[in-house]
Amino acid sequence: MMTAILDYDPSAAETLRSALGADTVVLPTLDALRRHLDTHLGEDAGVVGASVDLESALDLASAMRLTRPSMGVVLVRRRVDTSVLADALRAGVREVVEERDLPGINA
């Protein structure tokens, strides 16, 4: 089982990869992530980095909740507030983590 990471910022993606360990794959675009998930059914988590806009991240989480309910989506944000948490909860996001709290990621 692996974790798929989506972050448009290569440096941030590498930081996420380091925090999560060896069983990760970094994908540079939302389309690349979707293609990867279509062919890798064993992925158990997707981490969406802070450089991905919130609407796209929540759309992905909503789609995964319906099509792959066993896969958790972890949302990384530069700042987390009640609005982000409420939107993430409605979309089916498993965890919301502030970028500065990367040890809090339990993907």
Predicted regions and their residues:
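C-terminal output helix
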Residues: R100-N106
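Conserved phosphotransfer microenvironments
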Residues: L33, G42-M64
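Short hydrophobic/Thr-rich beta-strand motif most characteristic of the beta2 strand and flanking loop
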Residues: A22-A32
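Short, glycine/polar-rich helix-capping loops at beta-to-alpha or helix-loop-helix junctions
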Residues: V80-A86
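Conserved acidic segment of CheY-like receiver
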Residues: M1-R17, V25-V26, G46-V47
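Alpha4-beta5-alpha5 "output face"
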Residues: R65, A86-R90
